[in-house]
Amino acid sequence: MPDKKLLSQVRAIFFRSKEMIVVLSLFFASIVGAAAWQMTRAISTLCDDAALGALDIPLKFSLASFAVFSFLAFEMSYKLRRYKLDECMNTVAHAKRKIFLAQGVIFVVIILIFFAFFNIWSLLLFVKYRNFNCWHGKFIIQTVLNMLLSHFFVPCCAAAMGMSASLLFRRINGCLGLVLFVLLGSPLSNYLG
């Protein structure tokens, strides 16, 4: 586990970076906007499928979260190298691992905030659609597992992939690799071939 001083340095570099804060703020604002739009819409009383379709809207942000967190982690690792933090830590044993862990801790905290918001959004949707046939135990368990996969594990893997790409490749090659990976994982890949 990295020490508190290293964590505070990594956190300070992250919050000092205006472009990363702007991207993260815009991403969270789009999520809050989508949640507010969905919560203010009128409920269709036609069938249970309308409720089930509305309950899976939070899950549609998983690809966007993958892209955002992979590029944020890539830029964060690049900034740490640009500020020569890894070069200063070369005198310490296992310094690169400690920097990688410190950066990972910062991203896990951000991802946990992201994950908590999506869980609150899903809970509010379940309350909104309480009169529909969506309170089955199996459906709730499936929704929780999907939320865990889509909004915790996918962003964590994206952050780890972005940090690793920054360590392995130069800036342009790493960004192009991440763009290619995001495109291949998106629905656009169906139209590429």
Predicted regions and their residues:
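Central hydrophobic cores of alpha-helical transmembrane segments
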Residues: 25-30, 173-186
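Alpha-helical membrane-protein architecture signal
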Residues: 3-11, 97, 101, 141
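Aromatic- and glycine-rich beta-strand/loop motifs that create alpha-glucan
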Residues: 1-26
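Hydrophobic transmembrane alpha-helices of multi-pass small-molecule transporters
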Residues: 111, 186-187
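Helix-loop-helix units of permease transmembrane domains in multi-pass membrane transporters
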Residues: 74-110
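Secretory targeting signals
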Residues: 29, 35-75, 101-174
